[in-house]
A protein has these predicted regions:
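Gly/Ser/Thr-rich loops at beta-strand to alpha-helix junctions
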Residues: 29, 92-93, 97-103, 125-126
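Long amphipathic alpha-helical segments
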Residues: 1-60
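Predominant activation on well-ordered alpha-helical scaffold segments within soluble catalytic domains
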Residues: 1-2, 17-20, 34-41, 81-84, ...
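Conserved phosphate- and dinucleotide-binding cores of soluble alpha/beta proteins
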Residues: 104, 111-115, 121-220
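Nucleotide donor/acceptor-binding cores
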Residues: 90-91, 116
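A short, well-structured juxtamembrane/interface segment
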Residues: 71-88
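Short glycine/proline- and acidic residue-enriched helix-loop micro-motifs
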Residues: 62-70
Length: 220
């Protein structure tokens, strides 16, 4: 938004639409981003027909982006507080790949002095689990780290397993990092509660119409 150079309202809207098209051309179908871009396009359309009243469209657009950022921050904060209630003192908590919502849950548990331990797992192809390992360690949580082949070895003894989500459908299907399904099966085998930490930005409204959720494929 800070790169917008146009000064006339119509030109500003055209420039915003151009940026949205550029992002859509190169991004994988990550739902929170898609929802963000949809709100940007709604802003330009409302401005074009006059339902969005503003003297400075560029400033109004920046305010919209800040509003969205604040909404997302509030959602993550609430997830952290609700999720940490599930954790008791000295529980072992397992997680897979990288999730800001899951990390917020762990941060809250540490802040509440619950002295937890953790098990984290590597996720391919981008090795997101290494980032999770670093972030958990920085919280001062003792953590055991392994690849997905060690799920059956390291998950037993955990009180719960948390993952984030890429998308959630109207039928309750959860799309997450490859390997999450294996983790769910292991938890089912050992009777360990398995939780998905996500807010409504991960819900795909097109699934209400029967459209399948697009798989977010990433190159190895």
């Amino acid at each position: 938004a800070n790169e917008i150079r146009a000064t006339e309202p119509k030109d500003i809207m055209t420039e915003i639409e151009g940026y949205v098209d550029s992002v859509l051309a190169v991004t994988s179908p990550i739902l929170p981003l898609i929802h963000l871009l949809n709100r940007c396009m709604c802003f330009t359309e409302e401005s074009a027909v006059g339902t969005q009243k503003c003297s400075d469209p560029r400033e109004a657009f920046l305010e919209l982006l800040e509003e969205i950022r604040q909404e997302q921050r509030q959602c993550v904060d609430k997830i952290g507080k609700v999720g940490s209630r599930l954790i008791a003192r000295r529980d072992k908590v397992a997680t897979f790949s990288t999730s800001g919502s899951v990390m917020e849950i762990l941060k809250n548990a540490v802040t509440e002095g619950k002295e937890i331990t953790a098990a984290a797992f590597e996720a391919r192809p981008n090795s997101e689990g290494y980032r999770t390992l670093q972030e958990i360690s920085e919280l001062g949580i003792p953590v055991t780290f392994g690849c997905d082949a060690l799920l059956c070895k390291l998950v037993p003894g955990s009180k719960m397993f948390f993952i984030g989500a890429d998308a959630i459908s109207s039928t309750g299907e959860v799309y997450a990092k490859t390997g999450s399904y294996l983790a769910a099966l292991v938890c089912s085998e050992f009777g360990i509660p398995f939780y998905v930490a996500a807010d409504t930005s991960k819900f795909d409204p097109l699934s209400l119409l029967g459209f399948p959720i697009k798989d977010s494929l990433r190159p190895a």
